[in-house]
Amino acid sequence: MEWAEKYRPEHLADIVGNTSAVRQMADWAKTWTARSKPLLLYGKPGIGKTSSVYALARDMNWDVIELNASDQRTAAVIERIAGAGSTTASLTGSARKLIIMDEADNLQGTADRGGAKAILECIKNARQPIVLIANDLYGLAAELRLRCEPVQFRALPARSIAPRLKYICSSEKIACSESAVHEIAESAEGDMRSAVNMLYASAIGRQSLDGKNVHTSQKDERVSIFSLVTAVFGKTSDEELIRLSRDVDEFPEDIEQWVEGSVHTITDPAGLGLAYRSLSRADEYIGYTYRRQYHTLWRYATAVMLLGVADASAGKGIHSRILPPERWQKMSVAKKQKAIRAAVLSRLAATMQLPQATLREKYMDIITLLVDLDPETFARELALDADGLNFFLNDKSRAQEILKSLAKVEREKEPEPKKKGRKKAESPAKDADPAPAVDPVPKEELPVKSAPEERPADPPAPEEPGRKTVAHNQSTLFDGF
């Protein structure tokens, strides 16, 4: 058995790194109700997402149903497997079944036709916990992201990977030097699975391992935009900047906006002016590219913006978080609000049997006032999540508190296990005191009661001709009229 599988973590406590993500998963599982959002785990491959989900299921004693990229994930398959599993109880005695949809951002081609829509329907109707796993958060449809609770898994630092490698070497009785462990941990680039596989490949047939025997392999990965922006403002050579720009999977106009978002960190006025002139010149090249369809100009645009801003920053580095361009953030917020509004209007229209246009134009102000007066009832009847309730209340903290109280009430209503109920039913019979013995009364002393005289029944009243007898068993306000 390969070591990556042999030493896969069995419990959440065994997961290396990502402490906040693991804690978020545990809290979600302990407080899960039918109203809870599915979890969406995202992050680069090999950092423990799938292992964490299986460890969670083992800790909670939940059965598991998994669909991954190796399966056909058409609408029919998802409905038959995950859809049925999400609404039915477990046959093994487990309290719940955990539905795992791995590589949810990789629904492509005819083999996965209709899969994204089927996942949405499965989430809407689910009565069992669901976890989606993705490498790229934005590879999922926006509506799917909004219906899930995101949990980010980050790449592991080498100092977190090294102790796990030492533990494996100790378990396999292999003497491994510090240099070998350090080299493997650094080469893995945050990927625990890759580190364990490299250790396994290096240790085959050996009783000891040092730096000379280590077989490392660099994974063929694209450079992230964050690495490129950091390099632009750091002490990076021109050749290295051009190489990094070729390995980034972004268009030049997108790179330009990312770099522009961090230009404000340049404090020297002269340097700031040079940076903006470089970006302006690069923008002209990008415009020429689209107007003339001459894409060779892209290379000039990239070189001008990167080398110009790097020269302006003078290698002083960037000392703040690298954030997406502000325009993108505003567009993302607007898109999210639009999706929430559309979902709320759709539910209201279906409940009230009115067209969405009529609701939006005539009744939204009144409904908003009613929701503010009794948010619990509306949240329960319309199955609103935090975003949907906040759409009416415009108070996110209040919306979350209301949903927490509703979830607590639902958990209290859940039936207890049958064994406890049976014990409670049997306990009164065991604890009850026996009835006191009563001396029987002799038959001679028992008083004899005479049967009451039967009175002849009154003759029925004669019915009027042409009139039927009506029963006066009124069950509603309008009976008898």
Curated annotation (Swiss-Prot):
GO terms for molecular function: ATP binding; ATP hydrolysis activity; DNA clamp loader activity. It comes from the Archaea. Keywords: ATP-binding, DNA replication, Nucleotide-binding. ATP binds at residues 43-50. Residues 408-433, 441-457 have a biased composition (Basic and acidic residues). Residues 408-481 are annotated as: Disordered. Residues 471-481 have a biased composition (Polar residues). Disulfide bonds: none annotated. GO terms for biological process: DNA replication. InterPro entries: AAA+_ATPase, ATPase_AAA_core, P-loop_NTPase, Rep_factor-C_lsu, RFC_lid. Coiled coil: none annotated. Part of the RFC clamp loader complex which loads the PCNA sliding clamp onto DNA. Belongs to the activator 1 small subunits family. RfcL subfamily. Heteromultimer composed of small subunits (RfcS) and large subunits (RfcL). This is Replication factor C large subunit. It comes from Methanoregula boonei (strain DSM 21154 / JCM 14090 / 6A8). The lineage of its organism: Archaea, Methanobacteriati, Methanobacteriota, Stenosarchaea group, Methanomicrobia.
